[in-house]
Amino acid sequence: TGLIASSFAGCAKVNYVTEGAIKAIHQIKDGSWKKQAEGEKAGSSEDTSVLEKSFEAGKYGGVEFKSLEDVANYYKEAYDYTKTLTAEYVNDKGQTETFYKLLGDEKINVGKVMIDGKENAVINKLVPGIVDGLFKPNIYGLVPCNNRNPKLDNYNCNEKDPGKKDFRKSYVKGEDVLDANITDNGDGTITMVIQPKAAEMSMRGEDSQGDFFEVLGDISATVAQIDVISFAQGTAEDNIKVTYKGGTVTCTINTKTKEITKAEYDMVAEVAVNHANVAVIKDKSASLLIKYKNTFPASDEVTMKARQFKRK
């Protein structure tokens, strides 16, 4: 389970799992690691479309889309415009705060835990409970996002020193998109479903997956600092691999204003750790599948429960 902990350690938004997964080592008897049922091997490395229908050039909602690059450009324009919009919210102390108009929540699902290429029923049952118990969902603007306050939505969360990335602007490019489809909703809006190309060890705003999703970032650097984990050979950087593949972005856009009114970001990542030593477990490999979802807009009920504020 420390292997599972290492899978999450680099992500600021899901690092609550690290502590819980390390604790779970003490809940599993050593023998349970040996009683491994046969499971399916890790998925194909091929990057193929998961969309129900592939891209078809044409006019949707009065907008011409000739290529996937047109889809990417339109999405970027809509994202950029939507992130210029703010709204006033009131917190549980009665104070007014200004955040993005479009805010969303987050959910995470962890499954398909495999040890040495085989699924382990004990761990597969244990992990979701740990995750659910520890998960403290936050509220964000359109992802990737570092803060719901637009002034702080940058690499450093600092208005005066934003650092290398400003997440009020999308970094999406035509070459990021593997496939997409568009539906004219007949009410002045279109719905785009976009599948970014697969990527490994993604960073926010720096590759096909990091341009669209709230990715995990540099896991290996953090794992290297976890005392209970060591490696039988090589370093954390050598032995940890995160592959993002098969995730989709679904967004509804008002074609008159280019405002995104509704969106769902479904990120899928496989985390693999090799040659790991955790307590009495020596030189093991482990992998797990993370499904991370951001849903927009978040209701007042959700924002109050998660972060004690609601729309004014």
Task: Identify the role of each PLM range.
Residues K13-K312:
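Subset-of-secretome marker
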Residues T1-N15:
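Sec-dependent N-terminal signal peptides of Gram-positive bacterial secreted proteins and lipoproteins
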